[in-house]
Amino acid sequence: MAINTPLTNSWLDEFPARIAELDRAHLRRRRRVVVPEDGAHLQVDGQRMLAFCSNDYLGLAGHPALVQAACDGARAFGVGAAASPLVSGHSAANEALEAALARFVGQPRALYFYAGYATNIGIVPALVGKGDAIFSDALNHACLIDGARLSSAQIHRYPHADLAALEQELISSPARRKLIISDAVFSMDGDVADVPALLALCERHDALLLLDDAHGFGVLGPQGRGCLAHFGLSGENASPRVLYMATLGKAAGVAGAFVAGSEALVEWLLQKTRSYIFATAAPALLATALQTSLQLIEQDEWRREHLQRLIARLRSGLAQGLQGSSWRLGESPTAIQPVVIGPNDAALAVMEGLRTRGLWVPAIRPPTVAEGTARLRIALSAAHTEADIDRLVQALTELAKPGSL
């Protein structure tokens, strides 16, 4: 057969039809070209928008001090690590950042990764494997789910935040090694896990707790030190049964992620995490920017105070504005404020209605959320103003009225 002879009935011919099916189900996703502007504004496909979609919770991503620190790091170290951390990619800046991160979250040791998703899909298989057991909250982020699948351990998926059901699963499992994995702040609902209760279960059933604090680091706890500090479980009260993970591209405003825990746990992960061992290290310029970010997170309490006022203002406004509507505002104390619309097409219509008003709020649809719970995921930032919140509340109040869409 000639190399260029076209095949008939190839499975490769299925992709156009499969993409069309995504369109029919209102599930096709499209990237938008964005350019950051002042405050919480973006240019989205050339249109200036007030954005409520970024995880830049403290408004640090464009901070001049971080930009300067990154430039200084680039001049000192170049723009690429050019090797994995275990070869020659572990810079002095990355080493200093790991020490700073461990101190910041009150844990003995930290390990810095280039991305959050890569962290979780790597550390879970490094901790447990065939014959072991993982207990996963039903609403965990995809990276925890994928890490569990890659581990080959038996996966027990318990109903969201149902710790009684979790304990029954722990009791029933014959596995010697048990790993509980949970978001600390759930990314699509904004609620906070009951970390003390999860830790108590670990102590009763000889389990390890892996907490993904992607959306709590920098925001929760004294000086933004995260969910463990929020619950008084860091520093002198740190437990060897907790492995803490957080990302550095959200409230910290830069990129990357880290894990923190006991010396032995972190050393094991350094030795066995494939997504760490076989990947090029994060550029040192990011580490220099992150050290500056940690200083700002610690000292700028006004950012968290302002954010809390915005959360309260939004919730108060929507509690009134959505009265009589079928839409539901989720019970969230954090910067993630979900408005559950229901059908995919309805959520997209609301998103479009906001876009025509100069507001950018993405519609989140399956498989990110369950069928029938398509929603607006409103993400608030210290970069927003009270006037920004009022503008969003007014727009949603108008769109929630019958016949407005």
UniProtKB/Swiss-Prot annotation:
Presence of the UniProt keyword Cell inner membrane in the record? no
Q: Which domain of life is it from?
A: Bacteria
Which class of enzymes does this protein belong to? transferase
Q: Where does substrate bind?
A: R29, H141, T368
Q: PTM N6-(pyridoxal phosphate)lysine: list the residues.
A: K250
Keywords, A to Z, come to: Biotin biosynthesis, Pyridoxal phosphate, Transferase
Subunit structure and binding partners? Homodimer.
* Annotated source species: Polaromonas sp. (strain JS666 / ATCC BAA-500)
**Can you tell me which residues bind pyridoxal 5'-phosphate?**
G116, Y117, S187, H215, T247
EC identifiers of the protein:
2.3.1.47
Q: Which family does it belong to?
A: Belongs to the class-II pyridoxal-phosphate-dependent aminotransferase family. BioF subfamily.
> A Gene Ontology biological process annotation?
biotin biosynthetic process
Protein name from the UniProt record? 8-amino-7-oxononanoate synthase 1
Q: Which coenzymes or cofactors are required?
A: pyridoxal 5'-phosphate
In alphabetical order, the GO MF annotations are: 8-amino-7-oxononanoate synthase activity; pyridoxal phosphate binding
